[in-house]
Each structure stands twice: as C-alpha cells, then as structure tokens.
C-alpha cells in the first residue's frame, strides 16, 4: 500500500471514528459567540442594573424570636451561651440546678441551630424564586349569567326543554335582566379573513402596518361607540384604569368602518358595543354562544324597545328589543369550505357541517363511563389472553423475564365481539352503553368458554417448545388485523405538549407548516372515568391533516380499555394513538407510568400488544427517552418494538428521565436506536421462520431534542438518518420554526407579525373555548401560557451569529421598537397587558401565575414537563 493510500485510509478511519462518537453539534467559542450566551449585537444590549438597585430579600426571623438575645447572638460559640444578660458574674449553680441549666442551654443552642438552618433555607427559597416551578397553581373559573339558564341564553328556545314553560326550569329565562347586568361588550377590530388569504406578501405587510402600531396608542383609539356618550366612555376608562395598546382600530380599506351603527338609550342595551366584531360570527355567519357572547353587539339587530324601555309594548326576542342575526350567505360559504380532514359521509351527522372540530364523544358513552358500565368486550378477551399467556410463560421462567411475542390473534377479539353482540341480540338490545351491564352478565359463561378455547389453541405445545429452546411463545405467524401504515418521511412533527399544546396553538403551528400533530398527554384513568376535560384532549381541528392522541398509564388494565373506548367513541377521527414512555415528572413516574415503563419492558410489551389488538386498524406509536438514569437502555426496546410488538412508529427524545431538559440531547444514541430497529427488521425478514410472511418494512423513527433552527434540523437528519424530527420547545418559543425548516431560511419575523400571531391565537381560542366570559378568560390564561415561552425568542436581526441556539441565554436587551421590546418581556404582567389588546381588561378576581418562575432556558428545577 502506498503512503497516499495509507493516508487516505487513515483519514477515512478518523472520519468513521468521528461519526461513531458524534452526539450533538459542538459550537466552539469565537470572537462573536460564547457558548451559552446569545450573541446579541452591542447596540441592543442594555447596561446591567447597578447593584444598589437590586432588591435585598429580608430573612424572616419569626421562628427564632422565642430565643433569648444572648442565645441568638452566640449561635456559633457554644462556650459563651448563657441565660444571664446582666453585667454581674453568673451565679454558680450546683447539683440539679446546674444540670437543668445545661439542658436549657443545650435546648437553646439546638433551637438556634434550627432557626439558622430555617433562615438559610428561607434565603435559598427566596433565591429559588428566580427559577423552579410554581406548583399547585390555581385558576378561578369565572362565569357570568349566574342564576340564568345557560341553554336558553346560548341557543334560545332550542337550548332548554322547558322553554315553552319557563316556570318549570330551575333557572331564570329573563333575558332583559341578564342584558341589564351584563358587562360591556369587548372590542375586537374587524379582520378581513378571506382577503388576507388572497393577499400577496407586500399587501399583508401593508395591512399589518395599518393594523398595528410600533409605539403605544391611547385606549380610546380602539373603541369608539355611537351609543355611548363621551362622559360614559370617560367614566368607563376611569373605572377600568388607563390602558394603552399597539392595536389600531380598523382603518384598512379591506374592512371599512361601519356607518350604520344603531343608537339606543334603552337600559337593556347599554352593554352593547355595535362596532365590535365577534370572531365566531365573522367566519361562520352565526355565533354558537348566542346571548352570552362578549361581542354580542356584532350579531344582534335592534328591532325596538325592551320591557325596560317600554314596559307596555316590548319587542324582540324575550322582550329584549333585540334579535340574533344569522348571515345566511356567510353560513353557506362556511359550509362549502374545503377541509384538510373530514370523516366519511356515512359517519357525519347533520350538525357536522357547522363544526370545524371533530372527535366529540357521545353523551351516552360518557355517561356509561362515569357509571362504569361502558361495554368493553375486546378488552376483556385480550386481558384474559394476556393473563393466560403470562401464567404459561411463568411455568417456563418463574422470574418473568420472558415476554410474549407477536400480535394477539385476531380471532380472540372477533369471537369476543361476536359473543357480546349475540348476547345483546338475544335480548333484543343493541350494543349501547346503557345495556352493557346486562350484556356482560349474560356473556360471562361464553367468555369463560372463550378462555378455554384460547388455552386449547396450541399454546401448551408452544410452551413446551419454548422450554426446550429457552425462547418465548411465538405468535408472529398469527397475522394481525390490517393496520394503516404510517408513511412518515420528512414530515414535521409537533410534539404532544402538556398545557401549551392545546388546539388553538396547534392551529397556529398548522398555519406555519407543521404536518403531524399529537394532542396533549391524557391520563388513562381519567379517560376511563369519563372525565370531560380529559376527553376534550382528543378534539381535532379540521385543518390538522395528521392527528393522534397520547395516553399515559402504567398498567394494561388501564391502557387497553381506554384504547377500545377511544376506538368506539372517536373511531377514524384519530390517525394514530401514542403511548407516553418518556414523561419524567414524579407524579407520573411513581405510578409506574411515563418513563417508568422503560425499566419494565415485559409490562410495556403487554400494553403495546393489548392496545394493538383492540385498536383495530388504528396504528399505535410510542414515545421514549434514552433511559431513566445515566445508563442508556432504550436500544433494547427498539430491537423488539416492531418485530415483536408491531409498533407503527417510534420517537426517541435524546435525554434520560434524570436529565429532564438539562444538557444537550444525545443524537448519537438516537442514531444507534434507529439502526438497531432497522437491523432487527432485516434479521426478521431473513429468518426462515417467517419465510411465508410478507416482507416487513421498517417503521418511521423520529428523533427529538434541541431542534431550534433549520440548520439544526437538516444536520441531524443527515448525520442520524432518522425519518424525521419531532419539535417541542423550539415550536413553543418560535412557532414559525416550521416555515424556516420548509423554506430553509432564517426568518427575521417582525414584531407586527408576532402580535398578529397573538391575535390569531385569541380568535382561535374564542372559537374553541367560547366567546362568553368563561371562554374569554380561558383564552386569556392559555394565551399567557403561550407567551411564557414566546417571550424567550431573541429576534434574528439582533444576533451577531447564526443559527441561534436553544440553550443560549441572552443578556438584558431592547428590541428594535417598543412592541418588540414588550414581546421580549419576562414579566407576567406584561403578558396580561398583551392579552388586553384583544380580550379587554381581565376581571379583578382574575390572576395569572406563570408555571415557570423565570425565563431561564435550562435549569435543574425549571424543566418543562413535556414528555
């Protein structure tokens, strides 16, 4: 071999070695960049505050006030402690008195030591307020219409079955008294939604310039009402406090100001703002909240006087002098819209055309779950099969280290369904939840026979074979039901984000280009109890092209029935179901769920195989971490995830449970796990045991961790050869990251564009949670939750060095304009002020406590709790 060839070979070996040890990008220090510090240009950096301006936290000494001054003054010197503070020499004690005095001195010293430790702990606690989490946060539920019938106010006579006889209803149907006490309408400028979609980039920027100011404007700029006098407006502003905003009143040519605003001095109409815009009515042509809407003036018609204005001749609905408006042309246009996802026509109801959200559980199903009699025939059969299999495997291996392989036979599920259907048919009942208890009682004998049939299906022969080969039961030849394949290659996956990954936020990400969405993590036990809040997590917007939900649980007895209930209630509304095997929080881990499943692969095997059996053709995916501690163990799960468990896709977060979000994600280990899975599939295809089986195609493997720029995304794809990447914190801080990745550019997004994103979230939130008082304040709360992450974004135009890094913390800086500076504020009160620009002033009793006490990017105690 020549010297040149030897040199080339050495270089190749070095390159291969570098590939093997690569874990994550390493960016060394330069003249413009120091790792850990965002490289902001000098002209935008603000001087550090003087040390004298930093507030000094006083230590609470209440716990030590009971001690004598002498004991407090001599905490560190035990020899000088005494209870006598006079100038005279201490009296010499003898016998029992001296022993008693020594005990008192020792007790005083111990108390002083405890007080000192408590004071230090208090100082550390005050210190920790700069980081960590605000646990046990409480959010009050604020509602209006106390004592009034909510159904009647929302849907009129169709909303209350006692509408024809109001005296029979426990709640008041007096609409006039409700309007008289109702708070004044909120003001929201009109937005030309249809025209915005057709605008060019230049036209959109002009519209943003017309709609938002870069400097503060007076509050009177946004709300001018023809029906309110100047004195009333001044009194209202004085009562609410001075408010400033960056939102201009509608001055765009696309939405000309209304000149036909009605005028009324009727006391029942004093709360109406005729110039406001209801975001629901503006899009759909009708408002689902009816009279409860906080933007009521935009969709009512003045027809005359109310019973307060003219007691003898009241007009309008319920003597209110008003009528609700329905714009038929807008409704027809809404119903004829194109959707990214819709159910088959056979599964749509008549009201689905008016809904832009799917996956509503049935009222009968939720009621049956709360009563614990929801029919679960598949679950019962599958759990019996797994129990039988476990007992027989225990004969081979008493330690329980052998797990079952392959899918559960489809005949087990089919026979269970047939038995359940036959039991219901004999009694003349359908398989409705109401008759579930009777059906289960009558089918008990048949299920016992089914269990015996399963035991006689050749399992004993397989156990004998396993005993001689030290293997486990092989059911791989039993073909599962036909699953839908997940052809994910390069799709942008938005992670399931607890609290922040709500439907309005997912709609924001859809607009920026995300492809796959997974709903917030739901607890299996709460699903089984029919908890309405938990079942709302599976809600899907029609713009979400690929959508699944994530379940968290620690036992097959919990997760398998939830999977069957989801399939029965939601059906094709879910493209996949995901199992959370990565949640690091103690509350979940201590119950054996989340990342605790990583240490129990046998139990995880039962969960996956059982859920796969009851989900039918719905794919099942898993989300994992590298392990629970420093030792990385997840590659063992990847070796069997597809070949033995039939998982449809797998996502790996490159950190352990102990790391939470500390340190960099280990993408080298992600590559190792992806290769392990593909090698296991290759071995399965080459094995003669499965020669008559269809060739297995490797499932999609996604990586997760620290993706914050398009450069990060494509570098990891190239080095690890994963099928795609899941994006979590990067999307929370800058949701437009999906656009940057697809267009391969660094987007220096303007402050006006970011404020318009807040406007969209407000509209999406009001559409999702409702435009009544409760919905407005729920939207306000989750808007603040979103800003607790978006404020961490450092504008691209302020950086000396690109790309930006997720864990780089910026020094104190100012933006290029007042609005950009406000959007970067870490003060929660500033976030509330931003919500006021679209949702009005919050009630006095409303408050927001941020989940994270600081804007730190990576701390031990302030880690985000997304699995």
Swiss-Prot record:
Pfam families on file: Dus
One term of GO molecular function: zinc ion binding
Listed name of the protein: tRNA-dihydrouridine(47) synthase [NAD(P)(+)]
GO CC terms in record: cytoplasm; nucleus
Known role: Catalyzes the synthesis of dihydrouridine, a modified base found in the D-loop of most tRNAs. Specifically modifies U47 in cytoplasmic tRNAs. Catalyzes the synthesis of dihydrouridine in some mRNAs, thereby affecting their translation.
Domain of life, per lineage: Eukaryota
The keyword NADP is assigned to this record: yes
PANTHER family named in the record: TRNA-DIHYDROURIDINE(47) SYNTHASE [NAD(P)(+)]-LIKE
UniProt binding sites for FMN: 496-498, 550, 623, 653, 704-706, 728-729
Cofactor: FMN
């Amino acid at each position: 071999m020549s010297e040149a060839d030897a040199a080339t070979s050495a270089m190749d070996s070095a390159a291969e070695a570098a590939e093997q040890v690569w874990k994550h990008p390493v960016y060394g220090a330069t003249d413009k960049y120091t790792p850990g510090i965002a490289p902001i240009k000098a002209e935008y950096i603000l001087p550090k505050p003087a040390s004298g301006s930093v507030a000094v936290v006083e230590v609470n000494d209440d716990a030590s006030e009971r001690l004598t001054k002498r004991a407090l003054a001599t905490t560190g010197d035990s020899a000088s402690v005494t209870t006598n503070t006079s100038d005279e020499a201490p009296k010499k004690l003898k016998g029992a008195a001296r022993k008693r005095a020594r005990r008192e001195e020792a007790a005083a010293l111990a108390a002083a030591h405890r007080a000192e430790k408590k004071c230090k702990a208090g100082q550390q606690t005050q210190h920790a307020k700069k980081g960590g989490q605000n646990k046990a946060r409480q959010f009050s539920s604020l509602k209006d219409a106390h004592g009034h019938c909510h159904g009647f106010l929302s849907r009129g006579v169709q909303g209350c079955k006692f509408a024809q006889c109001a005296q029979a209803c426990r709640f008041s149907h007096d609409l006039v008294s409700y309007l008289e006490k109702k708070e004044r309408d909120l003001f929201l400028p009109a937005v030309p939604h249809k025209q915005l979609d057709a605008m060019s980039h230049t036209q959109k920027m002009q519209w943003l310039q017309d709609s938002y100011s870069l400097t503060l404007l007076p509050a009177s700029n946004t709300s001018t009402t023809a029906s309110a006098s100047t004195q009333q407006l001044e009194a209202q502003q004085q009562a609410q406090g001075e408010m400033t905003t960056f939102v201009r009143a509608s001055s765009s040519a696309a939405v000309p100001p209304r000149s036909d605003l009605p005028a009324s001095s009727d006391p029942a109409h004093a709360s109406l703002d005729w110039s406001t815009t209801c975001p629901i009515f503006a899009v759909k042509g009708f408002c689902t909240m009816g009279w409860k809407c906080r933007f009521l003036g935009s969709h009512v018609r003045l027809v005359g006087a109310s019973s307060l204005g003219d007691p003898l001749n009241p007009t309008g609905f319920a003597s209110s002098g008003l009528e609700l408006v329905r714009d038929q042309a807008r409704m027809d246009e809404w119903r004829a819209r194109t959707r990214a996802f819709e159910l088959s026509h056979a599964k749509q109801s008549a009201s689905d055309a008016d809904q832009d959200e799917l996956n509503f559980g049935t009222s009968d199903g939720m009621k049956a779950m709360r009563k614990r009699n929801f029919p679960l025939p598949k679950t019962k059969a599958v759990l019996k099969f797994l129990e039988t299999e476990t007992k027989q495997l225990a004969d081979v291996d008493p330690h329980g280290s052998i797990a079952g392989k392959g899918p559960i036979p489809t005949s087990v599920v089919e026979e269970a369904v047939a038995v359940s259907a036959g039991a219901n048919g004999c009694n003349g009942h359908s398989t409705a939840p109401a008759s579930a208890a009777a059906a289960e009682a009558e089918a008990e004998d048949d299920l016992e026979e089914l269990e015996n049939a399963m035991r006689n299906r050749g399992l004993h022969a397989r156990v004998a074979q396993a005993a001689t080969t030290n293997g486990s039961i092989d059911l791989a030849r039993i073909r599962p039901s036909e699953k839908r394949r997940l052809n994910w290659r390069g799709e942008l996956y938005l992670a399931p984000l607890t609290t922040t990954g709500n439907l309005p936020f997912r709609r924001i990400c859809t607009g920026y280009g995300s492809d796959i969405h997974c709903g917030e993590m739901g607890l299996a036990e709460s699903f089984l109890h029919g908890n309405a809040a938990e079942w709302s997590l599976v809600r899907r917007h029609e713009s979400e092209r690929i959508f699944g939900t994530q379940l968290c649980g620690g036992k097959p007895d919990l997760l398998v029935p939830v999977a069957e209930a989801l399939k029965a209630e939601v059906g094709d509304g879910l493209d996949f179901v995901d199992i959370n095997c990565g949640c690091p929080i103690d509350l979940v881990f201590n119950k054996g769920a989340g990342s605790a499943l990583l240490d129990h692969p046998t139990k995880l095997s039962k969960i996956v195989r059982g859920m796969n059996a009851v989900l039918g053709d719905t794919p099942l995916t898993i989300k994992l971490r590298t392990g629970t501690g420093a030792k990385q163990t997840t590659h063992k799960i990847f070796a069997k995830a597809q070949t033995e468990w039939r998982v449809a896709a797998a996502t790996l977060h490159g950190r352990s449970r102990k790391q939470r979000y500390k340190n960099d994600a280990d993408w080298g280990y992600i590559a190792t796990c992806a290769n392990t899975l593909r090698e296991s599939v290759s071995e399965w295809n080459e094995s003669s045991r499965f020669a008559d089986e269809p060739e297995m195609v490797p499932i999609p493997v996604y990586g997760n961790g620290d993706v914050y720029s398009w450069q990060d995304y494509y570098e990891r794809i190239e080095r690890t050869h994963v099928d795609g990447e899941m994006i979590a914190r990067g999307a929370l801080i800058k949701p437009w990251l999906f656009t940057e990745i697809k267009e391969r550019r660094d987007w220096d997004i303007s402050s006006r564009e970011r404020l318009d994103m807040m406007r969209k979230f407000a509209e999406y939130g009001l559409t999702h949670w409702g435009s009544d008082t409760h919905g407005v304040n729920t939207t306000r709360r989750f808007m603040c939750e979103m800003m607790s992450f978006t404020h961490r974004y450092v504008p691209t135009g302020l950086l000396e060095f690109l790309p930006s890094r997720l864990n780089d913390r910026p020094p104190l800086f100012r933006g290029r304009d007042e609005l950009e500076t406000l959007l970067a504020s870490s003060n929660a009160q500033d976030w509330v002020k931003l919500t006021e620009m679209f949702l009005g002033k919050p009630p006095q009793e409303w408050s927001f406590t941020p989940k994270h006490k600081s804007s730190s990017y990576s701390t031990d105690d302030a880690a985000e709790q997304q699995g």
